């Protein structure tokens, strides 16, 4: 999940929260690097990075099976919405959309708000990512109706499954779950909706987690399916890259 080692502090703007930031390498990468080595696994760790005094990022670090740092990604799209005041804390990423090479494949690691932007997923895929991974912190406001909750959750799942389809890649999205109060008391807090999931390269759901409790699961993902799916649905072959120049503009009218 996004910012794994504490509450989602971005519900308020509070300068004391900068004390939570840590360097990379730092305490978390040392602790979880040792765990990755002990278990022989690759870990994706979402952190509040202190790059320098007054300069902070929302960063995902990938730890190799031997405990070393394989690479990191700094969140590019930074929201500033009610209860998600991330621009107060985080500088936009400057590492681009670069997959991270690991012993289990090339990982296209993105973070939360990035998941709403198809361009981010596409650039990761174009640079050879073999799967997309999204540590996430997203949920409902206390005033949301059930209909609004259903719409938001449905949109969140749909767009990420769409990234899987459009790019012929598996997608893994890991979200927070449970209620976290607003420290300022101005709102009823956020009910993080969980529903972490994994989808295959045609958007098929491989597993869906509950919305109200944490679980650990082992899911088998066949990376070779991406090759077959891209042969059937050759979206990369048929892209009209000569006509896409407008995508680098903010708006066209």
PLM regions: where:
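Short glycine/proline- and charge-enriched loop/turn segments
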Residues: 11-19, 81-82, 142-143, 147
């Amino acid at each position: 999940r996004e910012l794994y080692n504490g509450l989602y502090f971005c519900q308020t703007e509070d300068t004391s929260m900068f004390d939570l930031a840590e360097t990379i390498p730092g305490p978390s990468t040392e602790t979880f690097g040792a765990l990755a080595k002990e278990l022989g696994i690759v870990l994706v760790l979402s952190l509040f990075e202190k790059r320098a005094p007054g300069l902070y990022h929302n960063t995902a670090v990938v730890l190799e099976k031997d405990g070393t740092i394989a690479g990191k990604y700094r969140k590019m799209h930074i929201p500033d919405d009610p209860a998600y005041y991330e621009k107060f804390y985080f500088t936009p990423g400057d590492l681009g959309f670069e997959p991270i090479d690991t012993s289990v494949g090339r990982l296209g690691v993105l973070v939360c708000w990035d998941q709403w932007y198809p361009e981010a997923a596409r650039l990761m895929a174009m640079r050879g990512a073999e799967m997309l991974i999204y540590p996430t912190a997203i949920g409902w406001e206390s005033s949301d109706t059930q209909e609004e909750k259903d719409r938001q959750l449905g949109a969140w799942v749909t767009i990420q499954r769409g990234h899987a389809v459009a790019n012929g890649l598996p997608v893994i999205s890991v979200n927070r779950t449970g209620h976290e109060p607003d420290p300022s008391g101005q709102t009823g807090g956020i009910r993080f909706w969980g529903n972490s999931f994994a989808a295959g390269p045609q958007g098929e759901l491989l597993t869906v987690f509950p919305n109200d409790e944490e679980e650990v699961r082992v899911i088998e993902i066949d990376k070779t399916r991406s090759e077959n799916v891209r042969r059937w649905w050759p979206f990369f072959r048929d892209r009209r890259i000569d006509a896409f120049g407008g995508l680098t503009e903010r708006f066209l009218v």
